[in-house]
């Protein structure tokens, strides 16, 4: 998915998603925003969450984030996402093994208003 600014139509980022139709799981594999600190990331995440629960049969939306991505973690928590746990040393990068934190939100939480728009 490509994110565009409403007024200018300029591309501001993208997301790679995977939707498992059998288990109704919506995974955000990657989200990248070009102009950081301007609210595009938050608006993009809000749009993805709304899309997942209002336009598809999604029961659970989830993503993973590295512990050093403090801005991302604050964003996901501000949107009502729940920390499911940590996959310790789950990814081998140039700088060594990295943990991955799993965040998710369920359809029931979205419907109850636990999602913060």
Model-inferred region functions:
Residues 1-36, 51, 55-56, 106-110:
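Acetyl-CoA-dependent GNAT
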Residues 33, 38-52, 73-78:
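Conserved acetyl-CoA-binding loop-helix of GNAT-fold acetyltransferases
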Residues 41, 45, 68-72, 89-94:
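Short glycine/proline-centered loop/turn elements that form peptide/ligand docking sites
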Residues 62-64, 82-99:
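Conserved catalytic-core motifs of GNAT/GCN5-like acyltransferases
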Residues 76, 81, 103:
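Conserved active-site tyrosine of GNAT-family acetyltransferases
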Residues 96-117:
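Terminal substrate-recognition subdomain of acyl/acetyltransferases
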């Amino acid at each position: 998915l490509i994110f565009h600014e409403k007024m200018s139509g300029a591309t501001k980022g993208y997301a790679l998603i995977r939707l498992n139709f059998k288990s109704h799981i919506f995974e955000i594999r990657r989200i990248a925003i070009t102009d950081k600190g301007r609210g595009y990331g938050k608006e993009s995440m809000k749009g993805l969450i709304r899309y997942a629960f209002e336009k598809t049969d999604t029961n659970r939306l989830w993503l993973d984030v590295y512990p050093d991505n403090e801005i991302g973690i604050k964003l996901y928590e501000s949107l009502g996402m729940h920390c499911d746990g940590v996959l310790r040393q789950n990814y081998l990068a140039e700088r060594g093994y990295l943990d991955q934190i799993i965040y998710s939100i369920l359809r029931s939480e979205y419907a109850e208003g636990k999602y913060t728009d």
